[in-house]
Amino acid sequence: MDALPCVLDNGSYEVRVGFCGDTSPRFVAPNCTARPRQQLRVLVADEIHSIKNLAQLEVTRPLEHGILVNAGCQKDIWERCFDEVGCETRESKVMVTESVLAPPSVQQTTDEVLFEDFEFLGRCRMAAPLCVAAAVAQLDRGNRTPGEGILPRNIEEASLVVDCGLAATTITPVVAGSPIRSGIRRIDIGGQLLTGYLRDLVSYRQYNMSNECVILDKLKKHLCFVSQEPKEDLTACDGTTHERGAAGPHYAEYVLP
């Protein structure tokens, strides 16, 4: 019996791995490596969660703006992911997502890692917006059964996929299962920009955290939210501090390491 094909959703912030037929990823981890300063040990993917003190971590990401720039780092992360899900790469095929704007040179580098380093039997390359458009089309038709093909046949619907990533936001129109490349728009605004803004706020007002991106990212995930009523939330926060003894509904404390 042939091994189930592996599905590799390779994002700039996280990497998600599973198998065809799964309704959710079997393994999700940060798509980066990190090394504590003045130490030789390198933490790969989810190993970052194993340390309590996130201060002074030097983070290396294999993707910048959704484009592969460090193949060696990416190989180490993928190897960790495949081991965690029990994927026998020499006996399996793989479907990997990529940026809709990925140049041919980057696609070639990705293939070299998959075939030369991991020795996969075959590879299916899929632009991430197409996966989203296909999933929406299947849900609209009431097809919630996994494993019935990646793209539904005879897609006639038009979709607009907005991908808000780590370092950029890409807007892709998809018609009949194909991206309209002339209509693709990209802006360099993503989660990383918000983390940088939070870093500036904290550094200017409280404590210099210009080199503590990992801590700030964790702080952002735990304490920040997208306001549905901005005016009301700002009014609720106005003048309510712990020192005045009148902490508002959004007041929170976070202890730095």
Features from the language model and the residues they span:
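C-terminal region/appendage detector
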Residues: 1-257
